[in-house]
Amino acid sequence: MHYRNGREAKNGDRILNIDAYPAPVIGILRDAVPGNDYCNGYTQIGPEPSQNDPIACMCDCLHIDDVLAILAEKGLDKRPEGM
């Protein structure tokens, strides 16, 4: 199973779920089953698993390290001076 950008997905990864409803969420990937890149597993958003955790569609998720790398590439990883 792989995220939108092709990175291998593993349970326990910290992810950005871009297509969560009603808004994107950051959480931990849980209960995903290898071999499926679509609606597979959940984005755990609290300290414990919940029935309200959004479904994680791998093609709509990114590993948080990749999101941080994109921000750094665009110069958005640091606060502007004077703020």
Residue ranges and their predicted role:
Residues 22-58:
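Basic/aromatic-rich interaction segments and small domains that mediate binding to polyanionic partners
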Residues 44-83:
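Intrinsically disordered, low-complexity, charged/polar segments
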Residues 1-14:
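Mixed-charge, Lys/Arg-rich low-complexity intrinsically disordered regions
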Residues 14, 18-21:
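Short, surface-exposed secondary-structure boundary micro-motifs
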Residues 12, 35, 72-75:
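Compositionally biased non-globular segments, especially hydrophobic aliphatic-rich helices
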